[in-house]
Amino acid sequence: MAQKTPEETKAFLLEAFDTLFNRRDVEAAARFWSKDYIQHSAHIAPGREGLFNLVLAAPERLRYENDLVLVDGDDAMMHGRFSGNGRPRAWIAADRFRLKDGLLHEHWDVLQDEATADESKSGRPMFGDHFPA
């Protein structure tokens, strides 16, 4: 399979996240994630089924907003916000992926509760250009 351009990979990742996290369409999302998906997150059970089950069990209001996608060959990183996750605060996430055969094959993440304006020592929001309400 020919390697995607960085722009194609970015579009692929954004479509994958929208399909799974915003539309909650696990059946359609299966075309983005490898059957042999390797999960390194401490918050998600193994395999793509662990990820899909997590999303299906999450509140209906779960949403993903993307801020940045970086691509280097078969490695990619996304910076975004998961809101409506059933927690008091949205999670700001850095998700790292390894792609194989054009699919999401391996995943690592770093998650942090989004800080309010009162909590931010820098005085700047963690995501976007304004603090959460």
Regions found by a protein language model. Give the residues of each.
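C-terminal and inter-domain tail/linker signature
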Residues: M1-A133
